[in-house]
Regions:
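PLP-dependent aminotransferase class I/II
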Residues: 14-226
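Glycine-rich phosphate-binding loop of ATP-grasp-fold ATP-dependent ligases
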Residues: 2, 6-11
């Protein structure tokens, strides 16, 4: 979202199972063998990380592109995102069906990778997943919470860490008492899934694109007020 740096790298192995493990490891721990289309999988299933992994997908050429893009990060990328966020702020402020918008404080300033909107479900006839579906019917890119509570992922429930030792979950040196995520629940985080809608505001977009998102959002909001 912030640069155009992409994917690359190579590991050679004669072990097919190990090859699939490597693919999962390089891509955040996704279960890539089951589903190769990660975007479709993210939309269909909330929990898709089968093991702990990292983001090892960038080539040297793409790194050079990313470094050069960072040079104009504060002069082009972030200013455009902030300008589009302001358009959203002004359009959604005061809507009965909107509970909260992104907040900036003296200690923290948004970079606006996404623009999350917390819906007031007491004022609406639909929840966030239904709202997202209505946006998509209008051909507007929109998502709910794509990565819900981490403790619900298989990687944590099954303690799928690194290697046969499953580090750090089952490491006696690192964690002598062991870890069990089965009984973990964060009710506030869980509740946000039903009422959060994420909107795009990419710097390559123009104001008319943002206005289309606004028009669709407000239309759906007004049609579904209680």
């Amino acid at each position: 979202h912030f640069t155009t740096a992409g994917e690359g790298g190579m590991v050679l192995t004669m072990d097919e199972d190990l090859g699939w493990e490597c693919r999962a490891f390089r891509d955040h721990g996704y279960g890539v063998k089951a589903r190769m289309n990660m975007l479709a999988l993210e939309e269909a299933l909330p929990y898709i990380h089968t093991r702990v992994g990292f983001n090892y997908r960038m080539t040297e050429v793409q790194s050079i592109c990313g470094i050069n893009e960072l040079a104009r990060f504060d002069s082009w990328n972030i200013p455009r995102r902030k300008a589009y966020a302001k358009m959203y702020d002004e359009a959604f402020a005061g809507l009965k069906g909107v509970k909260a918008l992104p907040v900036n404080t003296a200690e923290r300033e948004n970079a606006y990778w996404w623009y999350p909107v917390t819906l007031n479900l007491n004022a609406l006839k639909i929840d966030a997943p239904a709202f997202v579906n209505e946006m998509k019917k209008r051909k507007i890119p929109c998502y709910g919470i794509q990565w819900p509570e981490a403790y619900e992922e298989r990687s944590y429930k099954e303690l799928n860490g690194f290697g046969t030792a499953k580090f750090p979950f089952c490491s006696k040196e690192y964690n002598p008492k062991g870890i069990n995520y089965e009984g973990v629940i964060c009710p506030v985080a869980k509740s946000l899934r039903a009422c959060t809608v994420n909107l795009f505001l990419h710097p390559t977009w123009e104001k008319e694109h943002i206005q289309r998102v606004i028009d669709a959002f407000v239309e759906i909001h007004n049609e579904n007020l209680k």
